[in-house]
Amino acid sequence: QTIIKQLNQNIDSYISYMDNIASVIAQSGDAYKYLYSEKGYGATKDENYSEYRQRLVEQFKTILKGRADIRNIGIVREDKNTPSLFDNGLSVRNTYVDLNTQPWYADAVGKYDRYNLTSSHVQNVIKGERPWVITLSRGICNYTGTEAEDGVVFLDLNYSAISELCAQSSMGDKGYVFILDQNGNIVYHPQQQQLYNELQTENISLVMNAESDIVTAESGDDEKIYALSRSKTTGWTIVG
């Protein structure tokens, strides 16, 4: 139980650090001016607009250079014809993706008081890319006086970043750690592929409905003891 609680604290600290990065971008004058400027998409010849973009690109590049665990950084709006910006400024939006079907976007847009955090998923908002990531996102407030409020900043965190944190928590020869989000979706599991292929199972409903920090699942001769730690910061449940 102590190991699980410590891991929970480590993950909370990690996610809070990443949210600090997202918050700096979300509150940046360059970000909201770039996304919401009335000149918008056709303003690339405007001197100030080009400066907003260049400063954002340099900021993104600096972050990516210092954090190998961040796969992508981007700011985007719902409309495919409005500005977006990813990574080093060369990546292009995948126009076939409806952002309203993407939880990292739909659950963050218009919300400025806290971040949104997804379970592990395939990120396909950038053309030609399909990395397996966990996405942290925030709404970007519009201070330009126009009515649009659909901008979002997102950080795609490499799945390996969370798996490495979990791997550092030794649970003995047969023990292991996995993570569920607030809806019971799997964020991380060491045998995630086997779970998707139904070659392995976990009693997720038992875990999600547990009223104590330790629950026992029995299945024939097999008995599993789950130790739980729920995070008020991320909404995730760490299970070992």
Question: Model segments located where?
Answer:
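Extracytoplasmic/periplasmic ligand-binding sensor regions of membrane-associated signaling proteins
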Residues: 65-72, 79-157
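Amphipathic coiled-coil signal-relay and dimerization helices
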Residues: 33-35, 81-89, 184-190, 227-229
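Short, hydrophobic-rich beta-strand element in sensory/regulatory alpha-beta domains
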Residues: 22, 71-75, 175-178
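Amphipathic alpha-helical bundle/coiled-coil segments
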Residues: 12, 98-102, 156, 181, ...
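Solvent-exposed, extracytoplasmic
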Residues: 53-64, 151-194
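Short, hydrophobic beta-strand elements of compact beta-sandwich sensory domains
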Residues: 136-139, 144, 149-159, 220-240
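Juxtamembrane extracytoplasmic/periplasmic/luminal helical "stalk" adjacent to the first N-terminal
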Residues: 1-41, 66
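Extracellular/periplasmic juxtamembrane segments that couple receptor/chemosensory ectodomains to their
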Residues: 183, 192-240
